[in-house]
């Protein structure tokens, strides 16, 4: 069954983070049988928690392509660190509610170490809540300090 994707930016934005966004959006279109719309989170994972999703399918291909040379974070960013599932189960339940409401089955989180940690926490929580979500951490760092990115 076709599922939608959720993409969000996190941490300090770099000069190329929007190029990654454009690539995720454009590449997703190549998998029409698996991926429907790509929603972008307004201000990172907070966009999912607040259900502030940007439907990128409403944008033209040229508009998405222009992201490749647009500095800053087009969708906004955050430095919001999720607590563990045990400490704040309610937050994870909220994420699953939003993902279900928008038929989201893919989560792309673009950021550094904390963002990769967030993607892992969300994956584990979704597994515990019996919700199938493919979580992909997309590395981005100004400091070139990504640790333990291979599992």
Predicted regions: what they are:
Residues 1, 6, 30-33, 65-69, ...:
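Solvent-exposed alpha-helices and their adjacent loops that cap or buttress functional pockets
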Residues 1-52:
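N-terminal phosphate-binding or glycine-rich loops at protein starts, especially the Walker A/P-loop
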Residues 4-9, 105-114:
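A short, small-residue-rich loop immediately preceding and capping a beta-strand
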Residues 20-24, 113-133:
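Short Gly/Thr/Asp-enriched flexible loops that form oxyanion-binding sites at enzyme active sites
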Residues 123-149:
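Short, acidic/small-residue loops that bind anionic groups at enzyme active sites
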């Amino acid at each position: 069954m076709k599922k939608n994707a959720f993409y969000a930016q996190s941490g300090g934005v770099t000069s190329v983070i929007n190029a990654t966004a454009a690539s995720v959006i454009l590449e997703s279109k190549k998998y029409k049988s698996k991926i429907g719309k790509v929603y972008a989170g307004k201000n990172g994972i907070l966009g999912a928690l607040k259900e502030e999703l940007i439907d990128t399918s409403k944008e033209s291909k040229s508009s998405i392509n222009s992201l490749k040379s647009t500095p800053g974070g087009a969708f906004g960013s955050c430095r919001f660190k999720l607590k563990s599932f045990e400490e704040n189960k309610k937050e994870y339940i909220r994420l699953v509610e939003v993902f279900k409401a928008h038929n989201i089955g893919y989560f792309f989180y673009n950021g550094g170490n904390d963002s990769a940690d967030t993607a892992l926490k969300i994956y584990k929580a979704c597994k515990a809540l019996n919700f199938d979500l493919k979580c992909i951490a997309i590395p981005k760092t100004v400091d070139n300090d990504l640790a333990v990115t291979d599992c």
